[in-house]
C-alpha cells in the first residue's frame, strides 16, 4: 500500500498546483508519520511493524511529522548552509549553484564531490554523520532535545562502534538501492523499482535506528523510558 501511495507523489503536481501541493503534503506527511512510528515501535522493542494509519487530526498526524522529517535534515545541514550563504555573500559561490548544492545534500556530495567547495562537502558529511542520532532525538524527545549537543556527542562516543555500524548500514542501503535501480531496464521500471526500494530501505533504516536505542539505551546520556 505504501509503495502504491508513494508512486502517486511525482504525478500530483501535474494537476492543479494548490490542490497538488496539498495532496503532496498529506501523502508525504502520512509517509513521514509511518516512518516515525516504525522507529518508535522498534525503540520500544516491538517486533511487528505499526499500521500505516492515522486519526483525523491532520495537523498532529500528518503535517507535524513532515515538519519533523524535513527539520531533521535542516538541523544537520545548517552549518553547510551557513557556509554557502557566507560564500555567496563573499562572491565565491554562485547563488544558483549554492541552491543546487543545498538541495542536493549528501547525494550530490558523493556524485559531484570534486566539483563542490571542500569545506561544504565536509560539513555535509558531518551533518549526515549526526543524522541518525538527530532523527532519533526528534522522534522520541522532540526538537528540544537536538540542542543538547553535549549529550548527543557523549552518547555517540559511548556507543561509537554500534553507531558507526548503523551509519555504514545506512549508506550501504543507499548504495544498494541506487545500484539495483540503475540495473533495471526502462525509465518507468526504474521509477517503480526506485520507489519500492526507497520505501523498503527507509523502513529498514528506521528499524535499525530504533533498535539501536532499544538495545543500548543504558549507554545513552538521557532516556525516554
Feature locations, PLM:
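Selective transmembrane-helix segments that form parts of the transport pathway or gating/packing helices
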Residues: 66-78
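N-terminal juxtamembrane cytosolic/stromal segments of multi-pass membrane proteins
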Residues: 1-9, 36-57, 220-225
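Hydrophobic alpha-helical transmembrane segments of multi-pass membrane transport/permease proteins
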Residues: 1-14, 169-173
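Selective recognition of hydrophobic, aromatic-rich stretches within alpha-helical transmembrane segments
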Residues: 13-47, 81-150, 162-167, 171, ...
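Hydrophobic alpha-helical transmembrane segments of integral membrane proteins
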Residues: 6-10, 75, 128-129
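Membrane-interface segments at loop-to-transmembrane junctions
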Residues: 50-67, 148-160
Amino acid at each position: 500500500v505504501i509503495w502504491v501511495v508513494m508512486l502517486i507523489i511525482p504525478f500530483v503536481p501535474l494537476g492543479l498546483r494548490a490542490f497538488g501541493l496539498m495532496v503532496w503534503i498529506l501523502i508525504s506527511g502520512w509517509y513521514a508519520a509511518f516512518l516515525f512510528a516504525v522507529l518508535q515501535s522498534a525503540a520500544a522493542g516491538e517486533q511487528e511493524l505499526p499500521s500505516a494509519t492515522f486519526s483525523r487530526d491532520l495537523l498532529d498526524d500528518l503535517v507535524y511529522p513532515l515538519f519533523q522529517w524535513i527539520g531533521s535534515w535542516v538541523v544537520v545541514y545548517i552549518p553547510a548552509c551557513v557556509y554557502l550563504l557566507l560564500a555567496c555573500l563573499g562572491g565565491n559561490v554562485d547563488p544558483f549553484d549554492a541552491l543546487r548544492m543545498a538541495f542536493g545534500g549528501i547525494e550530490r556530495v558523493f556524485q559531484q564531490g570534486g566539483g563542490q567547495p571542500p569545506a561544504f562537502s565536509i560539513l555535509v558529511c558531518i551533518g549526515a554523520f549526526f543524522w541518525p542520532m538527530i532523527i532519533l532525538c526528534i522522534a522520541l524527545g522532540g526538537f528540544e532535545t537536538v540542542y543538547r549537543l553535549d549529550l548527543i556527542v557523549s552518547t555517540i562516543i559511548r556507543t561509537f562502534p554500534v553507531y558507526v555500524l548503523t551509519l555504514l548500514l545506512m549508506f550501504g542501503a543507499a548504495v544498494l538501492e541506487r545500484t539495483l535501480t540503475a540495473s533495471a531496464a526502462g525509465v518507468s521500471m526504474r521509477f517503480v523499482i526506485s520507489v519500492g526500494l526507497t520505501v523498503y530501505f527507509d523502513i529498514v533504516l528506521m528499524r535499525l535506528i530504533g533498535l539501536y536505542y532499544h538495545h543500548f539505551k543504558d549507554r545513552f546520556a538521557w532516556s525516554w523510558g
